Regions:
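Active-site-adjacent structural elements that line small-molecule/cofactor binding pockets in enzymes
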Residues: 1-281
């Protein structure tokens, strides 16, 4: 039996063009195959067609937590503009009560203006969204203690708000940052930083410098790298599929703490499951 990759590997599973039963069944199969986490992105509409069928992130993750027993569930990543942070904290705390120690809160500033227009959600310029993110993370961390929380921020105001039962252990807050500002922000306020492999080499020095500037150590913030599978690679010919143990070890040597196979589509699932069987079977 293989001991599997040297760092955790999860799967960011498509939420477009599938139904909830398919998602839940696939999540259970990913758990059985040995994957560490199943992740959903937080969009309300597709980047292709606005009328594409699409599952909502957190309700899907709640259902996933209910039908699994080991695998972590998380957002890759939630848009800070989509929900008031106090409401999001309550949602995450509830799922964490159902699945203690298995919930991950990935959060970022968003980047899909069309869905904001469609749903009537404001979409200010990136600097304001980043400032809101900083304030939101503070609100969420405070509510994860259970409360009461009172705060008068620039955007969020709470008056003796509670989030009870408080999650134990406290879910990680992972900031998604694919630009220098995002990497710096993650280094300053997050428990984890997620970025895509295409930006990793350029952003890693920025992240490391920001960690040092914030007086934080490397062990304070997990580095989570999203890795795309080639489009149409249903046969699983990429290194992540053919030799997942060696592939993960190369990433560990480059400084990654965790990996996420990004946006795995329906026609790629069988190859991903087979790779898991080779890695952990």
């Amino acid at each position: 039996m293989s001991h599997g990759p040297s760092i955790p590997v999860g799967v960011n599973l498509t939420t477009i063009g599938i139904d909830t039963r398919w998602w839940l069944d696939t999540a259970c199969r990913l758990e059985a195959a040995g994957y560490a986490g199943v992740w959903a992105w937080d969009h309300f509409v597709s980047r292709g067609r606005l009328d594409d069928p699409m599952l909502e992130c957190w309700t899907t993750l709640a259902a996933t937590a209910a039908v699994t027993s080991r695998i972590h569930v998380g957002s890759f990543v939630s848009n800070v503009m989509n929900r008031h942070p106090a409401v999001l904290a309550r949602m995450v705390a509830t799922i964490a009560d159902l699945a203690p120690g298995r919930v991950e809160l990935g959060i970022g500033i968003g980047g899909h203006p069309a869905e904001h227009t469609a749903y009537g959600i404001e979409f200010p310029a990136p600097p304001e969204r980043a400032a809101r993110l900083v304030e939101a993370v503070g609100v969420i961390r405070a509510l994860f203690t259970g409360g009461p929380v009172s705060t008068q921020g620039a955007w969020y105001r709470l008056d003796e708000a509670y989030a009870s039962p408080a999650p134990t252990p406290v879910p990680r807050i992972i900031v998604g940052g694919e630009r220098p500002a995002g990497a710096r922000l993650a280094a300053r306020i997050a428990d984890g930083w997620s970025c895509m492999e295409s930006q990793y080499d350029a952003l890693r020095p920025v992240f490391d410098a920001a960690l040092a500037e914030a007086g934080r150590s490397r062990s304070d913030v997990a580095v989570i790298v999203g890795c795309d599978l080639p489009a149409g690679d249903a046969a699983g010919t990429s290194p992540a599929m053919t030799d997942p143990v060696a592939w993960a070890e190369r990433w560990r040597e480059r400084g990654a703490d965790e990996l996420v196979l990004h946006w795995v589509k329906g026609d790629q699932v069988e190859a991903v499951l087979a790779a898991g069987e080779r890695a952990w079977g």
